[in-house]
């Protein structure tokens, strides 16, 4: 990790007007700061500041510190109307909030605010959220504190869904033991893709990658059920393991990394496009196969 975090969020302005394509920088940070209950955290802080509390200026170990600025690295971004949601997974100590937002009308380096509010500390670690056609924010909470040499599964991995019109938590669904084939599986649940239209809000499906143990978890909102799918095309390519960076060779074995959907056809079926992170190929499968537990899918390269 570099000394400074720098991430740019880009808005394509030509979507709003008939003009030549031009990319504008919406936000840029060197390091992240937070505002929680009106308190600004822009430097390392041992304790969370609370009204009328008494504090002693004693040093504490990193695993007890409330905020360690250098450790806060953003992972996922999603936009809904004037809000940009930013996730900070707990891969190090000192992460005050894993799900946050800023306003599009903010300055170029706004402070993050916990979503939906400062009481969201029941969320452990989120990567890449998604907003669906029904105005809902979906995410997978891995439940895992992923600090090297201190990995701790604080709670079972779960799907969380928020109503963005009311900012209420609509659903928290814990994944089943059969969805997770080893203790490594929770750390691989880094993305969720929602299959729904504005006319079928109660019949949504979600497709979750598991890059760590190379599978896919499918969730049905109507059935409130989930199931795991295994296939060779979800696995890393053993001929593409080695990456050379700055003259150093790194071996990587991540499997299924992301899933994208086509527009639905006249029957409501989509194509799901996906790939393992370590692979030279892109694959497709129809969502009808994914929605039917136990059915053998036909995957195409």
Model features per residue range: what roles?
Residues 86-92, 139-143, 203-212, 270-278:
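Conserved beta-strand positions in repeat-built beta-propeller and related beta-rich domains
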Residues 67-80, 120-137, 179-206, 236-272, ...:
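Beta-rich, blade/repeat-based domains predominating
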Residues 94-100, 149-150, 154-160, 214-218, ...:
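Structural motif
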Residues 89-92, 147-153, 207, 250:
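Short consensus segments that form the blades of beta-propeller domains
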Residues 30-66, 108-122, 168-187, 226-251, ...:
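Surface-exposed loop and turn segments in beta-propeller and other repeat-based domains
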Residues 2, 10-34:
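N-terminal signal peptide
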Residues 64, 72-73, 98-157, 170-179:
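Blade-loop segments of beta-propeller domains
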């Amino acid at each position: 990790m570099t000394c400074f975090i720098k991430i740019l969020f880009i808005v394509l302005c030509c979507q709003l007007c008939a003009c030549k394509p031009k990319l504008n920088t919406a936000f840029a940070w060197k390091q992240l700061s937070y505002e929680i209950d009106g308190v600004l955290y822009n430097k390392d802080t041992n304790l969370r500041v609370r009204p009328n509390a008494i504090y002693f200026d004693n040093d504490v170990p990193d695993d007890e510190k409330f905020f360690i600025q250098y450790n806060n690295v953003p992972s996922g971004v999603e936009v809904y109307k004037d809000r940009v949601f930013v996730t900070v997974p707990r891969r190090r100590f000192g992460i005050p909030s894993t799900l946050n937002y800023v306003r599009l009308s903010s300055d170029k380096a706004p402070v993050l605010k916990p979503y939906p509010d400062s009481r969201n500390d029941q969320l452990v670690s989120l990567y890449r959220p998604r907003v669906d056609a029904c105005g809902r924010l979906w995410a997978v909470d891995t439940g895992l504190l992923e600090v090297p040499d201190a990995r701790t599964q604080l709670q079972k991995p779960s799907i969380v869904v928020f109503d963005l019109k009311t900012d209420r938590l609509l659903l928290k669904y814990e994944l089943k033991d059969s969805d997770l084939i080893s203790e490594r599986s929770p750390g691989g649940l880094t993305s969720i893709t929602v299959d729904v239209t504005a006319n079928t809000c109660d019949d949504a499906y979600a497709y979750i990658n598991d890059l760590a143990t190379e599978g896919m978890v499918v969730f049905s909102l109507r059935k409130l059920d989930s199931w795991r799918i295994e296939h060779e095309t979800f696995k890393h390519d053993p001929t593409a393991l080695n990456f050379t960076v700055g003259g150093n060779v790194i071996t990587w074995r991540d499997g299924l990394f992301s899933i994208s959907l086509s527009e639905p056809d006249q029957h409501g079926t989509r194509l799901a496009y996906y790939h393992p992170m370590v692979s030279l190929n892109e694959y497709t499968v129809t969502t009808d196969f994914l929605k039917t537990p136990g059915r053998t899918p036909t995957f195409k390269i």
